[in-house]
Amino acid sequence: MFITTWCSNDAPDSSVPRTRSKTKFTPKVRDLLFHCRYEIVDIVDEGYDMPASIGFYNDIIREFVTDDFCLTSLFEDNGQDSNNIQHRNDGCIWSIFDRLMNTNKFRDFDVIQGTFDTLQIIFFTNHESANNFIKNNLPRFMQTLHKLIACSNFFIQAKSFKFLNELFTAQTNYETRSLWMAEPAFIKLVVLAIQSNKHAVRSRAVSILEIFIRNPRNSPEVHEFIGRNRNVLIAFFFNSAPIHYYQGSPNEKEDAQYARMAYKLLNWDMQRPFTQEQLQDFEEGWTHQKKMREEQLVRTCFHDNNPRLPKVNHVYRTRIIPNQQFLREPLKFGNPFRQ
């Protein structure tokens, strides 16, 4: 039934679409895919071990999850078949993470890449359904991702950090991000991954740490951890970023990222967010200062305080000396003068 459904694609050239072709299923075929949902669940659960089958399976899953009911059936799977007989210990989503944690079975990067592509297809097609699944299974989901970012396979580490970065930057996952980033164990894993000798792991981990630094409402434990290790992180980023410009190479890009992180840590405010009373006092003081400046009761410029100096417009023009390589001919200094 499943092969019949897949071969019923309305492409005029071939009965079975190619791996990279864009499938166009009719509503009737979508209904047949929903009836084949248990077969799809078995495919997601078993996975693939050959690079040649990755694109074929991901095309099927990509088309399957476009329907909300089909996607919900993946998230609600608990190991039962169509006859409600328990033939698996867990759902198909957790089987994907279990395969990633068993790194001894992976010998090809294409298989790992295809597995993370499957996760991206499932979790980022419908953010609402994925967010409900994560919130209902948040402790286990956090523990699973923590194991992946702490594993010995650097490729799985980098892909796990990328998955978390896309998950945190989605606006619909605000509540999940807040609960997740309140855990002090998570930021410790991120800081540990920054010291990795793999460029892909370091760059992804720094992106996650940047979210921590920009968050004004960190938990007290996370806030204390950043404040206690702030100087160490600043010294690490400055020592790791000897180049403070970017001209396109990957090393210079990483140096620019490290320099930006050191600058943000230098400007990081260690005070807690303002209370309502402190915010009101600040606004009153700012309004009073603004009124005084408008009435010219406070002189803000040295020239205004000294009436003997001529008035200036505070616009300073500087002439940049041109680079010698852009001149038409080199500079000529002539012969030295002899007495």
Swiss-Prot record:
Domain of life, source organism: Eukaryota
GO biological-process terms attached to the record: intracellular signal transduction
Coiled coil: none
GO molecular function: protein serine/threonine kinase activator activity
Family: Belongs to the Mo25 family.
Classification via PANTHER family: CALCIUM-BINDING PROTEIN 39-RELATED (PTHR10182), MO25-LIKE PROTEIN 3 (PTHR10182:SF32)
Protein name per UniProt: MO25-like protein 3
Organism: Caenorhabditis elegans
Organism classification: Eukaryota, Metazoa, Ecdysozoa, Nematoda, Chromadorea
Gene that this polypeptide is encoded by: mop-25.3
